[in-house]
């Protein structure tokens, strides 16, 4: 990958000039001038997904200039580098190949001269065999009973992805009850353990190194809880499996290494749900549905790798995001799924985006003088409408939004889905076009209100509009369409990182807090006051010691 400061390109300078021409242009005017705007600024993927980006503050000229930026920063070369197994994660000297995990074409993908696909397929086959034993009930616990509950113990990428997907695909789930434990706060695992029976519970310990503090603390507590009933250490092997690469530590824990599912250093944590980390997904919805998830992602991978940038959905969404973040000064993006099963989707891509592109140093090691990753947040509709949409509609901050909805629901109760979708359509229309003062005044006159009332109330009922949105309409949330949607966002994030000249696939920002926590932990073992930190940290620790039970 080339190291090009995007702000030093001629395309960036052209975009800055273009922004000065565009900053006061309204969406209402853009739509009024072009009756064909929707067809020009929308695209359908695989007859499964409609992406409408027409309600953005862009013109064809805007997109052309953004595409020039992609060309000048060699996005095409960056895409080829990732798919060909080059070590584009340079700070960790690793390839970035989550695309290999869902390579359903099974074409060779090389890392260090070796095709990784045979190993990928072998782990998938092992997961298939194991999951079929658990789901069928042929796998028995230490008292001869079949497994009824699965507890996934992990954190970050070992938790957020599997949890999001198992929730999103709940309509496809089998009889197994899924539980997820991530937080080192003992409350998290304590509450889960209240719901399960040691005789019929399987624990998945998801840690590549088998040393992650939060995960191993929870795993040891789960094992202690299990042994309090089971008694004999030999029973651990029937109730614990590992998603890891550290066979020695896994064996010492009591897990049979035959039930250790490996993945590789070219799989980043936040891109790992496609790997052995996705075992909880397979146990929840079955192997065939997991393969459909992989197939949907692979279809989007092929679209991303092979489609011209002018028609390339991840590229288009990425460029529009850069336009708002760096030229309009928008600091956040909201992801708003109108599907309750998708309630963890925004949280998943909060990590996916912010841990990937939350960097202030470029690929040359220099501090950047432009914006990199945005703040990502969101909640399902319509809940969000009654919480934070007020600020999006009438606040002082621009919040570009992605609205996501399925045309067909899994729960066709009465007219619920029509009401949900009427809100989905209405919100993007309201955000784009608003409500002008003269319209509000006329509404009040039609109600027979006197002029004094008009003056007191009308200013507060005006909606400026011109708030940008993307709408992503799926036929239905299926394993295939969900896989494609996740991959769409993954490649959007990669595209932005490539253009913005940052390393998307490391996460050094999580390390300093860990180091300091490891230094502080021994200081909490007694009741002595400490003075080894700044006055604030000393004061907090000493008050904690005096207050704790």
UniProtKB/Swiss-Prot annotation:
Q: What is its EC number?
A: 5.3.1.9
Active site at: 355, 386, 514
InterPro entries this protein is in?
Answer: G6P_Isomerase, G6P_Isomerase_C, Phosphoglucose_isomerase_CS, SIS_dom_sf, SIS_PGI_1, SIS_PGI_2
Give the UniProt entry's GO cellular component terms. Answer: cytosol
Q: What class of enzyme is it?
A: isomerase
One annotated GO biological process: glucose 6-phosphate metabolic process
Which GO-annotated molecular functions does the record name? Answer: carbohydrate derivative binding; glucose-6-phosphate isomerase activity; monosaccharide binding
Catalytic activities: alpha-D-glucose 6-phosphate = beta-D-fructose 6-phosphate
Q: Which one Pfam family would you cite for this protein?
A: PGI
Q: Per UniProt, which keywords does this protein have?
A: Cytoplasm, Gluconeogenesis, Glycolysis, Isomerase
To which protein family does this belong?
Belongs to the GPI family.
Physiological role: Catalyzes the reversible isomerization of glucose-6-phosphate to fructose-6-phosphate.
Q: What's this protein's name?
A: Glucose-6-phosphate isomerase
Q: What is the lineage of its organism?
A: Bacteria, Pseudomonadati, Pseudomonadota, Gammaproteobacteria, Enterobacterales
